[in-house]
């Protein structure tokens, strides 16, 4: 079931919210869990059992890790490694499910490619959301092991955490420790519901009115094999509005349910370095790899060569997380190289001079935009043999663009320009300034209501005239 579908907007969500608000607080997590199962079953019935199995194993894993740690509390450290073994077992077991369903065919394909063998593929469909809920469960294991959180003893509460429909399919990656208190007790106010509805509709408009329309231009230009610069820009904007739109919708739904989810995007295209870009793009994934891979490896507290190895591991895995394909691995390694080069260059005395810092601010934006455009060509093109020609096409003249392609591009000019403006903090800053005015004190609620209703109706009108498009990150 898609957030951007009539079924979700006018059937599932109203019924779920009505029941959720109507029942006593002690039953809210049960309603949330059952609603999330229906939500998942609607779109992925054959893998619903896998989701439930993952929930059960995650619950048992947390309890076992906590139990072993309590037994170990009176044992000398040198003799007590049982908790590490238990942690490793449950992490390995949880990862095994992800590897089987997401990477098994990719591994067989790679072996066939390298050795000339003809091993049969299993052609397993990718379960929706498995990359996201697997990472949430692993973070829960590690946090229980570290003592950052207590293992959840209430199965329904834990199940509600893992399966929570707002963020189940495509994030944000919500850590248990960030919402553990809210799982037990949370307040639901009119202000939270109103703010959540506004955030949800904002994300809906991003998805339906911007990302889906840009997607049609991307599909057209891919077939036409012309206008490669516009294609690269349109796809980058489509991916941003599609994924940030989903994140906005998830955060808004979470707020309507009384939860505070972490932010996932913070205007990444205003960044002046790739390092800054990845602090603003898919922030919950970057934070996950930092806390559960990069820092445990040793982080930056080592020599430069060792640090480069840490970066390679993190970005190789990050690329692989995004998809079972060598283009995704290449995409991850590409960013790992850029980030390593930024640190190497930034550490030299020459580039620490004030004159170079000033020049960096001027050129940084252009560098980031160009590097990101190139990266998403690698991301989009699945065949490795086609990546080079697609990038070279940006710099190779093709003569005049055909009249049909030129007309198509012109018809999207306003949308692309508005999308570029919307990707900056401009609209956010205008909105925040408006909130500080006397007009807002008097009529802000009315303006907010009008915008929410208008955005919902406009998106609905568009959905009625076309089929709902799946979110791009569903395939990851």
Where are these regions (language model features)?
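Membrane-embedded transmembrane alpha-helical bundles that form the catalytic cores
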Residues: 1-475
